[in-house]
Amino acid sequence: MEQMAKRLHEKMTRYNWTGFYLVDPADPNYLIVGPFAGSFTPNARIPLDRGLCGAAATTGKVIVVQDVSADPRYLAGSSLVKSEIVVPIFVNKKLAAELDIESYFAGTFTPPERQFIESCASVVANYLSTAH
């Protein structure tokens, strides 16, 4: 996961924060920041009922926001962020993690970009399912 976050961050120049949130083993009502690349995030622990990460966790669906200023669910980690995608990662039909990517550019996450990011999350899901 660490390598994937690092490589995506390095190679995809419009990705300004790339990382994973994991279901907190101590309290599954929270997500905790996992491996990431980019600036420090003040959102190291997120309740499942808050933010775009919480929305992806509770709905089980990919969340794509092309303009975070227009979405009241957005938890600001940086005032520079303009768009975000969150892809839930399931292992044995249970939420295990999320791939979260933020961009300083509005409209970054086009349908082909989304498909690519979902395929990256799928690789992580396969890895996690064999690691458990």
Where does each model-flagged region fall?
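Juxtadomain coupling helices with adjacent low-complexity linkers
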Residues: 103-132
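Regulatory sensory and allosteric helical modules in signal-transduction proteins
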Residues: 21-79
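Short hydrophobic/aromatic beta-strand element in the GNAT-like acyltransferase core
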Residues: 17, 86, 98
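Sensory beta-strand/linker motifs that couple input domains to effectors
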Residues: 93-103
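A short, aliphatic-rich beta-strand micro-motif
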Residues: 83-90
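Flexible loop/coil segments at beta-strand boundaries within sensory signal-transduction domains
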Residues: 90-95, 131
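Conserved beta-strand segments that form the floor/walls of ligand-binding pockets within enzyme
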Residues: 63-64, 88, 100
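Intrinsically disordered, low-complexity terminal regulatory regions
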Residues: 1-40, 128-132
